Design a protein with these regions (language model features):
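Peripheral, non-transmembrane regulatory/ligand-interaction domains of membrane transport proteins
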Residues: 1-197, 203-204, 214, 218-225, ...
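Hydrophobic alpha-helical transmembrane segments
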Residues: 37, 121-122, 196-213, 231-249
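Hydrophobic alpha-helical transmembrane segments and their immediately adjacent juxtamembrane loops
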Residues: 42, 220-314
Length: 314
């Protein structure tokens, strides 16, 4: 899919032509769409389609006619009826006339620009647009990390009494997400630092310098949060694995003790079911023998139960 946007000081609209000062947004573009843009702006098609590889690393490539910036952005995906965070590459290409973004699927990081929910955003201010995207991306990482933290607290409350593996598996999924986030954030940080350096060929104004510095701070804060949450999740995973095992052991112990208590009346009643001679059966001839035997069996079971409770085995 190809979208072309143009903004002025008074309006923001989608157009059909490739004009100077536009923003071209490519979402999983076809080969023909890629060739059209590559030929129009003298871009190597391999660079244009590089962000469509989900394994592409964050980097900056500087060519004579354009600069390619690739960063990892967070998105959500559904697996096993649950929502998880993953990262995919976003490519940003800046030329003399336009800015091009390319990715595998629609991204939340670009929605605020498409829906015009961000102030001081203009497609013709290409450098600032790049820094605004990077800043918004850092904010999304912080939001995603906060969401992961809340989710881990919910799982923690369920795990205290759990004997199942589902919650533990979900906790491990969150831990894996944090690991991917940390890797993506650190490569994004290197890209941002390179943009802030004097060797960057992207023109920056004073306001842009401040925005880029804020972006670096937000990214570093996200890295610190990911480190903290990652350590907490790792500890939680190990701790609750032991808790689940302990809960299962307690259930097995309870079942074993119930079996012992129930075996007392079973042994008594089984004795009366054996082939004794009439004069050998205890309480033979007693008119209330049945109820007396039941009472004795019940009393012995209760006594055994109280003894086990006293010993804190129950």
């Amino acid at each position: 899919m190809k979208q072309v946007f143009l903004s002025t000081t008074t309006e923001f609209k989608e157009i059909d032509t490739l004009e100077p000062g536009t923003w071209i947004n490519l979402v999983n573009p076809t080969q023909n769409e890629s060739l059209e843009i590559a030929n129009a702006f003298d871009i190597d098609i391999a660079d244009l389609r590089a962000p469509l590889d989900a394994e592409e690393m964050s980097r900056i490539t500087i060519e004579d006619e354009y600069t390619l910036i690739i960063v990892d952005v967070p998105i959500t995906e559904e697996r096993n009826n649950r929502t998880y965070y993953v990262t995919i590459p976003l490519g940003i290409i800046i030329t003399e006339e336009t800015i091009i973004t390319t990715c595998l699927e629609p991204l939340p990081v670009l929605d605020v620009f498409i829906n015009r929910r961000l102030r001081n955003f203009y497609t013709f201010m290409r450098s600032r647009f790049i820094f605004q995207i990077l800043y918004r991306n850092a904010e999304l990482y912080l939001t995603a990390l906060s969401s992961i933290d809340r989710k881990s607290e919910q799982i923690e409350s369920q795990l205290h009494k759990s004997t199942r593996n589902e919650e533990l598996i979900e906790l491990m999924e969150l831990e894996k997400t944090i690991v991917y986030f940390k890797a993506s954030l650190k490569t994004n940080e290197r890209v941002i630092k390179k943009l802030t350096s004097a060797t960057s060929n992207i023109k920056k104004y004073l306001e842009d310098e401040d925005l880029l510095e804020d972006t670096l701070i937000e990214t570093q804060q996200a890295i610190e949060m990911a480190d903290i949450y990652g350590n907490v999740l790792h500890s939680m995973t190990e701790t609750f694995a032991s808790i689940i095992s302990n809960n299962q052991n307690n259930i097995m112990k309870t079942l074993a003790l119930v079996t012992i208590v129930m075996s007392v009346p079973t042994m008594i009643f089984s004795a009366y079911g054996m082939n004794f001679k009439d004069n050998e059966i205890p309480l033979n001839g007693e008119p209330h023998a049945f109820w007396l035997i039941v009472f004795i069996a019940f009393a012995m079971s209760v006594s055994l139960t109280l003894y086990l409770i006293h010993k804190k085995w129950f």
